[in-house]
Amino acid sequence: DVAPSRGLGDVYKRQVIIQMNSIHDITDYIILRVKSEDRFASLINLKLQKLLYYVQAWSYGINKKPMFDGEFEAWIHGPVNREIYNRFNSTKYLYSEINIDDCMNHNVSLSSEDAEFIDFILENYLKYSGAELERLSHNEMPWIETRGDLNVNERCDKVITPELMIEYYGKKWETIKS
C-alpha cells in the first residue's frame, strides 16, 4: 500500500483562492523536475499519466480541491487524462520516453505551495515504474469502482469522479496523519 508519508506539514492548510493550474503546466513541471535532475531518469508516457493522476487524486484527498483542470478516465492501463494522452499520442506510445524537448513551457510558474505539494507526491511515487504505478492504481477503489463490472482488459472511458478521489485518498490521508 503506497501513500505519501507524513511531512507535508501546513503547506495546504491555507486555503488560497488562485487561478486553476493548467494540466499542461503541471505536466511540463513534472517532466522538467524529473529530467532536469537526471536526464537519464525514466519517464515513460504511462508513468507520466499515473504521476499526474496521483497529484490530482491526493490534492482532492488532502485539500478537497483539484490541483489542475483535468479529469481522469479509468482506462485499461489505469487512470488516464485524455487531453495529455492526445498531446503525446501522435509521437509517443504508452512506453515511449518523455523528454524535456516534449515540454510546451520550459518556464512553468506555479505557486510555491503547489510546487511543494507536487514535489511531495513525486518523492513518494517516482521510485515506481510505470507498470508498478499501473498495478497500484488497479488496486485502488476509485479505478475499480469507476470500471464497475468491466473485465480488466475491457475498454473504459468513464471518468473517475472527484468524489471518489476525495473519499478514498481523504481516508488514506486521515490514516497517515493519525
Segments predicted by a language model, with ranges:
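Domain-edge interaction signal
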Residues: R14-S178
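Single conserved hydrophobic/aromatic residue that forms the stacking wall/gate
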Residues: D1-Q15
